[in-house]
Amino acid sequence: MVLRRRTLHPLSLLVQAAVLAETLALGTLPAFLPCELKPHGLVDCNWLFLKSVPRFSAAASCSNITRLSLISNRIHHLHNSDFVHLSNLRQLNLKWNCPPTGLSPLHFSCHMTIEPRTFLAMRTLEELNLSYNGITTVPRLPSSLVNLSLSHTNILVLDANSLAGLYSLRVLFMDGNCYYKNPCTGAVKVTPGALLGLSNLTHLSLKYNNLTKVPRQLPPSLEYLLVSYNLIVKLGPEDLANLTSLRVLDVGGNCRRCDHAPNPCIECGQKSLHLHPETFHHLSHLEGLVLKDSSLHTLNSSWFQGLVNLSVLDLSENFLYESITHTNAFQNLTRLRKLNLSFNYRKKVSFARLHLASSFKNLVSLQELNMNGIFFRLLNKYTLRWLADLPKLHTLHLQMNFINQAQLSIFGTFRALRFVDLSDNRISGPSTLSEATPEEADDAEQEELLSADPHPAPLSTPASKNFMDRCKNFKFTMDLSRNNLVTIKPEMFVNLSRLQCLSLSHNSIAQAVNGSQFLPLTNLQVLDLSHNKLDLYHWKSFSELPQLQALDLSYNSQPFSMKGIGHNFSFVTHLSMLQSLSLAHNDIHTRVSSHLNSNSVRFLDFSGNGMGRMWDEGGLYLHFFQGLSGLLKLDLSQNNLHILRPQNLDNLPKSLKLLSLRDNYLSFFNWTSLSFLPNLEVLDLAGNQLKALTNGTLPNGTLLQKLDVSSNSIVSVVPAFFALAVELKEVNLSHNILKTVDRSWFGPIVMNLTVLDVRSNPLHCACGAAFVDLLLEVQTKVPGLANGVKCGSPGQLQGRSIFAQDLRLCLDEVLSWDCFGLSLLAVAVGMVVPILHHLCGWDVWYCFHLCLAWLPLLARSRRSAQTLPYDAFVVFDKAQSAVADWVYNELRVRLEERRGRRALRLCLEDRDWLPGQTLFENLWASIYGSRKTLFVLAHTDRVSGLLRTSFLLAQQRLLEDRKDVVVLVILRPDAHRSRYVRLRQRLCRQSVLFWPQQPNGQGGFWAQLSTALTRDNRHFYNQNFCRGPTAE
């Protein structure tokens, strides 16, 4: 952590304030704090938990701000002066600041207050969004307004005064003001003629408002009218009178089909939306008509008379399964481009066959037909025969129909067809059933479904989305994903030679492909076989596809998980046009080809495998990728890599430009080894376990342009780490543990960066932190600088923006605490001394001198206790030769000579007494100069002479010093024991020792004796009888 620290005096606070004020005046900080300035004049204040509209600094150029977004804050009160400084604002978004009770996540009640002139100050305002706020009336609005959204509010009434004066208004959204999520007591009321004064209004949306009829006297300028999901059960010409300019009309969901509803549904009392035959006759400009989810059972051809410009018709989620096969309603819709008939199934029934009505052949302009969820089991040439000759039909959706037999060759006769979606069916192979004639269709077998509530699967899963993006520019694409295919046979694709893109993902294909499965598909360029169980062993796999450019074999892990089974990747060599290959998430780790060879492959996805284990197998797989001579992009994410050796990088293709090592377990990376990849431009190391960027630097001459080391545990970066990478443009250091960002890391290239991402790091926001100046210098290149770059310390600023520093935190904290402590001490002394002198001056004087007198005595006693010359004075009867011999040859030798550094200092009469002194003086000095007095006795019944005198002096020491220093060693355990010995054994057993008669017990005896001589006898007393001598 590199910080520029300054030693500051508290008096410098005013100086610092002046400097900071000057800095703010110069505009070095982001001008729109706490918000973020985005391109095209947008100030983004979303998700900042603001409680009021922010006031920007004087340095902010508010005249250039045209858009302000305040989504998802906590602004409950808007004042007249809130937007005065934004005179040129054109777009204002205030969604989700004070949501109504039903829409609040915790169902809190909230009411937004808007003062009368709040928006009138913005004379150029064109777009205002007040959706998802608890407002009950329309506020006063500027006449310049063009687009207004009042959806999901509590506004229940629109009258002539609500929108008076808004002559420029073109778009009005007021959806969801009264429905199950935002309930009200009745319905939204739009008084007749309330909107008639809006002469330029072209778009009106009133969905989910419990309306029972279309509002009367709407402006004739309307082009888009959306009144779906209300309670309108009847529609006649008078409901749409004078709306001759109408181009799009949505009246769907007003009489719902509840068996297919994904949300609360009320059964329609009319059983079906009642449409007058002439309801739409006068709408000659109508281009889009939505009648979905209206419980329609039949189609009346008169509904569409006069709709000569109708191009989009949505009839989904009705009961039109009979009309689809017999209707004449489509005869005059020659300009219809898109028709949606999905989920018009009969309840609990799956048809054996389906044949479209002959009137479909008149849809000569039809480009897209959606027939998902009609539920029929056989698809043959008669099913769609009236569509085959449509010259413009390019997209056909047949998902979720329970189709189990499909004659795919029929799509080869469609002249303009570009995309067929047969996913999420039950197709298991080529059609084997006898083909029914059109006449047999009416008597087709019906199968009852087990579930009465079939709900559609998501139409756009991530896998299907990626597949569609890859194939959107091809001439012919077919999606057979999520079916029941187990094997692939060439007869399935007869007459489909022009097919260029095919998806067979999410099936159960478990065969060994050998070069014969796709023979008819000579023009196929993209093949998706992900999420299957393919066996890749034959070297001729996919060789029948000479134009194949992209092959997805990901998520075919089952064969690779079979122990002992080998797999062959040599087929890649023979695919001369292949550019993109995915072997991802197959758990490939052993028994595969030791090399991948191809001159054409440019992108290889090998993520989700076991490359870490493969590279650990000696040199067997060291050259696994080296044969891909033209490889540009390699993905090795999630490969359980714990270490990456230089030779691993050295044996990657030199042509490599992108290398992804994301989400592995790398804790070390040899940066100098990047020189082995001279063309590398992008390196992704995110999600690993790097602790620091300190082992070397990026090599000189590298072409690296983007480096991502986010989501690691990086705490430090070595100086000049990035400096030599002169081509570097993007650096991602986010989600690490960095406490600072230092200029020395980058050197001169810092100004060449286009992106420097340091979000989600616990930066230390100390006064003078160097990273603040650096980030301000490159602030346009730092994503989320205003709010995403936050402090991790000190505690007062944790989790807050780096620009939220308190001026008081810029003081030198050590100096501040020192000054505080000294001043506190001075005040305390100044108060306590006079008070004590006044109240108890004499007593303090007496106690002081008393303590002063005791100090030398205490010092002397401690000094004497710490400097006693002997550990034990040994007393024994010299007249007993056996005892004397044991003392000199056993006791002395054991305690003084054989203990090494732990040797005890013994005081012996014949050796240590001073000549010239009396016996009593020597005895006194020996007892008081030793920590313990050790009595060695042969028996305890008769003690006299020196032994008796020594014992009495030891007892005298007990009385004077409160120290029990007596230790008894009895050499004959069977001798008679005196009452004193028996009492001492009861009170202090460890101070009475007996010489063992058996040699194997002598080791324990010496250990017990050492303990008795080195520890205070107070610890040996039996607490049940006595606590031992204590100091007073």
Swiss-Prot record:
InterPro entries: Leu-rich_rpt, Leu-rich_rpt_typical-subtyp, LRR_12, LRR_dom_sf, TIR_dom, Toll_tir_struct_dom_sf
Repeat (LRR) residue spans along the chain: 62-85, 87-110, 122-147, 150-166, 167-190, 198-221, 223-242, 243-268, 283-306, 308-332, 333-356, 363-386, 390-413, 415-440, 471-495, 497-520, 521-544, 546-573, 575-599, 601-623, 628-651, 653-676, 677-700, 702-724, 725-748, 750-773
Keyword Transmembrane carried by entry: yes
Main localisation: endoplasmic reticulum
Glycan attachment residues as annotated in the record: 64, 129, 147, 200, 210, 242, 300, 309, 332, 340, 495, 514, 568, 670, 695, 700, 732, 752
Coiled coil: none
The keyword Lipoprotein appears for this protein: yes
Induction annotation: Following Helicobacter infection, down-regulated in C57BL/6 mice and up-regulated in BALB/C mice.
Covalent lipidation (S-palmitoyl cysteine), chain numbering: 258, 265
GO CC aspect terms: apical plasma membrane; basolateral plasma membrane; early endosome membrane; early phagosome; endolysosome; endoplasmic reticulum; endoplasmic reticulum membrane; endosome
Disulfide bonds: 35-45, 98-110, 178-184, 255-268, 258-265, 471-501, 765-791, 767-810
SUPFAM superfamilies in UniProt: L domain-like, RNI-like, Toll/Interleukin receptor TIR domain
GO biological process: activation of innate immune response; canonical NF-kappaB signal transduction; cellular response to chloroquine; cellular response to lipopolysaccharide; cellular response to metal ion; defense response to Gram-negative bacterium; defense response to virus; detection of molecule of bacterial origin
Tissue: Expressed in the basolateral region of gastric epithelial cells with high levels detected in antrum and body mucosa (at protein level). Detected in spleen and stomach at higher levels in C57BL/6 mice than BALB/C.
Post-translational modification: Activated by proteolytic cleavage of the flexible loop between repeats LRR14 and LRR15 within the ectodomain. Cleavage requires UNC93B1. Proteolytically processed by first removing the majority of the ectodomain by either asparagine endopeptidase (AEP) or a cathepsin followed by a trimming event that is solely cathepsin mediated and required for optimal receptor signaling.
GO terms for MF: interleukin-1 receptor binding; pattern recognition receptor activity; protein homodimerization activity; siRNA binding; unmethylated CpG binding
Swiss-Prot/TrEMBL keywords: Cytoplasmic vesicle, Disulfide bond, Endoplasmic reticulum, Endosome, Glycoprotein, Immunity, Inflammatory response, Innate immunity, Leucine-rich repeat, Lipoprotein, Lysosome, Membrane, Palmitate, Receptor, Repeat, Signal, Transmembrane, Transmembrane helix
Topology term for the membrane: Single-pass type I membrane protein
Transmembrane stretches, start-end: 819-839
Stored PROSITE patterns: LRR, TIR
Effect of residue 132 to A: Significantly decreased NF-kappa-B activation
Effect listed in the UniProt record for changing residue 668 to A: Significantly decreased NF-kappa-B activation
Described function: Key component of innate and adaptive immunity. TLRs (Toll-like receptors) control host immune response against pathogens through recognition of molecular patterns specific to microorganisms. TLR9 is a nucleotide-sensing TLR which is activated by unmethylated cytidine-phosphate-guanosine (CpG) dinucleotides. Acts via MYD88 and TRAF6, leading to NF-kappa-B activation, cytokine secretion and the inflammatory response. Plays a role in defense against systemic mouse cytomegalovirus infection. Controls lymphocyte response to Helicobacter infection.
Record's subunit section: Monomer and homodimer. Exists as a monomer in the absence of unmethylated cytidine-phosphate-guanosine (CpG) ligand. Proteolytic processing of an insertion loop (Z-loop) is required for homodimerization upon binding to the unmethylated CpG ligand leading to its activation. Interacts with MYD88 via their respective TIR domains. Interacts with BTK. Interacts (via transmembrane domain) with UNC93B1. Interacts with CD300LH; the interaction may promote full activation of TLR9-triggered innate responses.
Protein name: Toll-like receptor 9
